[in-house]
Structure formats: structure tokens, C-alpha cells
Amino acid sequence: MLVLLSCAKTMSETSKVKVPLKTVPRFQKEASGIALQMSQFSVDELERLLRINARMAVENYKRYKAFHAEDTSELPALLAYTGIVFKRLNAKDFSKEEFEYAQEHLRLTSFCYGLLRPLDVIRSYRLEGDVVLPEPGNQTMFSYWKSRLTDVFIEDIKKAGGILCNLASDEMKSLFDWKRVEREVRVVTPEFQVWKNGKLASIVIYIKMSRGEMTRFILKNRIENPEGLKSFSWEGFEFNESLSDEKKFVFTNGKEI
């Protein structure tokens, strides 16, 4: 089984964690070209383009200007992203064998690097899927990557057993020909819901935390099939069979928030 996670907006440039190997992103050339184009924008342009504040615009202006420098720091993707999902995944305590297993059974989407393996070494950036760049052809990042990623993604899933556990945000489907993905492999999408005001609701913070915890559960326990996902339990979240079907696995928390 292969797990898909979304990249995070927040990134780190340092880590003391040792990994068994470091790999080059399969779309390094494309990422380099994207970063070069992004480096042509001014601070004000980045602020508007990425919908970020002035401080973050300055930070990412510096990142893109330094992207191709030899001394720019870089980290394995699994350690570089620091959003809520990755904090809960907590790969800092992974063993050598767990990192190696993750390398074969986890993929991370990236608007800059396309599709990453956990130990692919990357540099810090900020990018959104709706950003349009002139080369090639004034395409959004979604359109740019779709034709490049779909074959590789499907091949990765098949190598990992032909089953995808989709724990990425919904917008990431647009990076691929998702209908084709669903035709060629089995896709299971876990959902996480909590009780609020007497109704089940999807709350972003709980979704992100649960995605990270489930990914950790899968990698630590080497879950190879959807049936194994049903035993996931965390902070009151349990598999809810009555709300689930073969494509959608719903996990609910019985506590009112």
C-alpha cells in the first residue's frame, strides 16, 4: 500500500536526524526551472501571488534567490516539512528500517518538486497550485504537473501493492489524472469527523492531526492493506463501519468538542 500526503506550507532548513540514505528528487530539473522563474518576482509580486504577508514574502524572495546556490541548506522531504501533519507523523524517531520502508510506501505532493519520496533532498520554497508561470505555456502548477506525474504515481502505487491510501488534501487530486488513477488502482480515502453541536463535522485541525497519526501508524506497523487501516485508533477516533464504504473509510470521535 502507498500513502499520499500533501506538502506543508511551513518548512525547516535544519535537522539533527540521521537518515539511511538521501535521494535526488525525480523531478529535480523541473523544480529547478520553476524556482528560477519564481526568483524573477519581486517581494511585492510574491506577496500577491502567494497570498502571504510582507514578512513571508521577504523570506521566500530570499529563498528563491538562494535556491541554486551551492551552500543553500537542504533536507530530506520527510524532515523538511513542518506542518501539523508532519509534526504528528514525527519521523524524528524513525529507525533506519522505518525510513527505508517509508521511502517505498509514502509519497508527498509538491507544487515545486511534483512528487517526492521521503528521503528526496529538497530546498525550502513556497508555492501554490494556482500560480501561473510563463514556461511552459502559462500553465497553473496543477496543469503543469498533471501530465508529468500521473504515470509515475500509478507506477509507484503498483510497486507498493496496487492500493493507495489517500491522506492528501482534496485539491492535490488535481496534480494527477485522478479518474485514471482510480481506474488503474484501488483508492481508499480515510475521513475524520468529530461531534460538534450534536452533528458530525469535519474540522481542519483534527483532520490534519489524524492524517499525520494515521501515516505514522501505517509506516510503524507496515500496514499493507485497507483492512489493516480499520484498527487505527487515536484520541477517541475509531473506524465507523456504518458510515464507511469500500472507497471511503470514516473515523469518528465519540466526544463532543
For each feature predicted by the language model, list its residue ranges:
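Active-site helix-to-loop segments that bind/position phosphate- or nucleotide-bearing substrates
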Residues: 4-93
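Internal, well-folded beta-alpha domain core
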Residues: 91-245, 250-257
